[in-house]
Each structure stands twice: as C-alpha cells, then as structure tokens.
From Swiss-Prot:
The gene is mtd1. Pfam families: THF_DHG_CYH, THF_DHG_CYH_C. InterPro entries: Aminoacid_DH-like_N_sf, m-THF_DH_NAD-bd, NAD(P)-bd_dom_sf, THF_DH/CycHdrlase, THF_DH/CycHdrlase_cat_dom, THF_DH/CycHdrlase_NAD-bd_dom. SUPFAM superfamilies: Aminoacid dehydrogenase-like, N-terminal domain, NAD(P)-binding Rossmann-fold domains. This is Methylenetetrahydrofolate dehydrogenase [NAD(+)]. NAD(+) binds at R187, S188, D210, I211. One of its GO terms (biological process) is purine nucleotide biosynthetic process.
Length: 320
C-alpha cells in the first residue's frame, strides 16, 4: 500500500522589515541630536512629480520631527534648482542638503550632485566623498577625527547586512565580507556602482549586473589589494546569481521581476527599488531572508550623515 502523505517543505524564509532595522539607529540619533544647542536643519529639494520621491520626502519629514531635527521641503522648478542649491549652500542656518532624484534624468543630475557643498552633502554624492569611497579612504583628516561621508542608500544596505549577520565580526574591520559572494542588479552612479565598491572594499566578491554586462568588483585573491578593482566578465545573471550568498535588486520598473529560480537556497535577498523586484511567494521557496524595502534605514543614514556634518561645521566632530 503506497503512502499518500506528502511531506511539507521545511524551508522557512524570514521577512525582515526596514522599520525593525532602523530602530537602533533612531535611538542613536535621538541621543546625538541632543549634543547640539540647536536642532540641525535639513533642506530637501523636490523638482519632479515622482510619487516615490514625494513619499520619501514625507518619511524624511516625519522622522526628522520625531527625532528633533528641522526639515524643510523646497519645491523648485528644474531650471531654478541650481540657484536654489547655491543659496542653501550659503545659508548658515542650513546644515544639510539633499535632492530628490531624478531631476533631469541625465548627466545634468550628476552635475547637480556637485553643486551641493561637501560641507552639507548628507547624501554623500559629491566628488570628494565618492572619490574617498572608491579609493577606500575612510577619513577626511590626517588625525582621523572626521569620517568621510558615505552615500546614504548604499550605506543603508551595508547596515542591513550587518544587522542580518552577513558581516563576520570576528574578521578584522574592513575585511568582514571576505568569502561572501554578492550579486547586485543595478549599476547606477547613485546606488548600484557605489554599493558594489563598498561591499568589495569590505572583502566581498561582487557581481554587478546591468542590461549591458556583468562586472566583477573584488580586492583580489586573499583581499590583498587596499581597494577594489573592476573587471568585465562574460558571465550572465544566470551564472552568478545561483552562487551568491546575497542578491540585491534595484530595478526601477514595475515590469521587472528577478527570477526566483536563480536564488540559492538560504540566500539573503534585498530590494531597494520603489518597485517590487521580487515575487515574494516564489522567492520564499528559496531565500533564507527577504528584505522587501530599505527606505526607513536610508533615512536613518541620511540623518546620521547630517549629525556628522553638523558636528564638522562646529569643528566638534562626533563619532556616530
């Protein structure tokens, strides 16, 4: 007599929400904002009609109010944005500046990133901070009292990976992703490329995927190099995803879905797009951990950068 009972799959995928990860950082921010005799002021510039940008601005305002920062949203026509940024650069009452991208959705957006003063660039997108990140330079001064500012969205993903235990705390700081393979589906200059650099500089082998090709970011065999190198490969997504411990996706299209069958059993999957890049139901058959969004952690990192920059403006750097 045959046994008709079917065993249930015992695989379990844990869903981790950004709000839970952000809690610890919010408490740190509340403690550090009290170190100042005033509430640091963040100005956000909105020059597009993107609903996701509007939602991000609303979240930023809500979080600033809860913690004790000042926040002002300035809605400015695209053609007036550069002058508005320069005005904020020169306003001593403004401690931090951010722009809700995209604005022109072309190379002019990269130019606008450079218009923001490095002293107030909470997004960490100006040339000085980007160069430091790519060259793995972690401080702004020889005395190493001022940490360089990292791009807030890539930094948020790093902090999520730390929270999830992907970073190995036993290994020396700066090498804690050694032995990890990570695939990133996005190579934008704002998130995907800097994220690949950050993770590779921490010791990971990173496959960066876009519509053109797959590149490999690595510090070499045995992480011997001080900073990462980038090499073109002949690989495709289906070659690198199944060998990855972590898959990070940020495709800005409602029509894109990452193929769940390419996810290695037990892998960590993170979506940083405003669209749902993963099909949750099929993904949970493979992934060990799924982080469906990162927005609240990104805002926490934005405000972390604001505290650092405010302390630098006062020449009283704080370590946060």
């Amino acid at each position: 007599m045959s046994n008709t009972n079917k065993s249930e799959p015992n695989h379990s995928c844990k869903v981790v929400y950004a709000s839970r990860v952000a809690e610890t950082f919010v408490e740190q921010l509340k403690q550090h904002v009290n170190l100042f005799e005033f509430a640091p002021k963040l100005v956000g510039f909105l020059s597009n009609s993107d609903p996701a940008a509007r939602m991000y601005a609303d979240w930023t305002n809500k979080t600033c109010t809860e913690i004790g920062f000042q926040y002002e949203l300035r809605e400015v026509p695209k053609d007036d944005l550069e002058d508005a940024i320069v005005e904020a650069n020169n306003d001593p009452s403004v401690n931090g500046i951010m722009i809700y991208f995209p604005v022109f959705n072309d190379g002019q957006d990269q130019y606008l990133q450079q218009v923001v003063s490095p002293d107030k660039d909470v997004e960490g997108l100006c040339h000085k901070y980007v160069m430091n990140m790519y060259h793995n330079i972690r401080h702004l001064d020889p005395e190493k009292t001022k940490k360089s500012i990292l791009p807030c969205t890539p930094l948020a993903i790093v902090k999520i990976l730390e929270y999830l235990g992907v970073y190995n705390k036993i290994i020396n700081y700066g090498n804690r992703l050694y032995g990890k393979t990570i695939t990133i589906v996005n190579r934008s200059e704002i998130v995907g490329r800097p994220l690949a650099a950050l993770l590779a500089n921490d010791g990971a082998k990173v496959y960066s995927v876009d519509i053109h090709n797959v590149q490999c970011f690595t510090r070499g065999a045995g992480i011997r190099s001080k900073k990462h190198d980038v090499a073109d490969t002949n690989f495709k997504l289906e070659d690198v995803a199944p060998i990855s411990d972590v898959i990070i996706c940020g495709v800005p299209s409602a029509n894109y879905k990452f193929p769940s069958n390419l996810v290695r059993d037990g892998a960590v999957c993170i979506c940083f797009s405003s669209e749902k890049n993963f099909d949750a139901a099929s993904l949970k058959e493979h992934a060990g951990i799924y982080v469906p969004s990162i927005g609240k952690v990104t805002i926490a990192m934005l405000l972390r950068n604001l505290i650092r920059l405010t302390s630098y403006q006062l020449n009283k750097p704080v370590d946060i």
